[in-house]
Amino acid sequence: MEAAVLCKGFLFDLDGTLVDSLPVVERSWRCWAKSYGVDPDAVLDFIHGKQAITTLRHFMPDKSEAEIQAEFLRLEHIEATDLDGIRALPGAIELLEHLEANAIPWAIVTSGSIPVAHARHRAAGLPTPEVFVTAEQVKHGKPQPDAYLLGAELLGLPPQMCLVVEDAQAGIQAGIAAGCLVAAVNVPAETPELLEVDFVLSTLDALRVEKLPDNQVNVTQNA
């Protein structure tokens, strides 16, 4: 059995979808959690797919916004400069190069800030999109739909004609809320939202993408 959808563009999450940044994320946040006396595992369970500032506000409820912002800037610098182990995930470069070669619109839509996202993007050697949505551009981060709605708007496409590619539950929720098609990559099988997505993938190279004469894109996956 083969899954198939028609779309006109792609909206990719970055961390965990296109780029393996898990070693950096775990190092940074475990160090932060220990310095604040917070359970590191609780922090790592919370952060996936969310903006860093959201995590800090959650775990620093007794701190002022000024203190939280100062801590965010310190953590941002650590994450933007620690690039050891950053690499493109299997199939990511090949898929993006295929989209580029066929003039298929695509964007990166990340919960990361500009310094962190751009540093990891460069370190992984990914092609550069014309549209790169970061945390600074939206009022509400994932799981709210704002980032994916903005990504679709900047591509000049209706959300329902965009395929969101995500690895995080918060991002999948954001894509669904935006009204987009959704492909879930390397997501735990018990994630409830998998019942609502269009594709469930182990890696990106499971997708086949074909541009049609009418500029629609046929996306398939062998089961």
What are these model-derived regions, one by one?
Residues T17, S21, T110, G171:
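Ser/Thr-glycine-rich phosphate-binding loops at phosphate-binding pockets of nucleotides
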Residues L18, D45, A88, W106-V109, ...:
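Conserved SAM-binding loop
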Residues T17-L18, L83-D84, P105-W106, E136-Q137, ...:
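A generic structural signal for short
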Residues R27-W29, I78-A80, I104-A107, A135-Q137, ...:
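N-terminal start-of-chain detector that recognizes signal peptides
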Residues A3-N102, P115-H118, L126:
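N-terminal helical cap/lid subdomain that shapes the substrate entry/recognition surface
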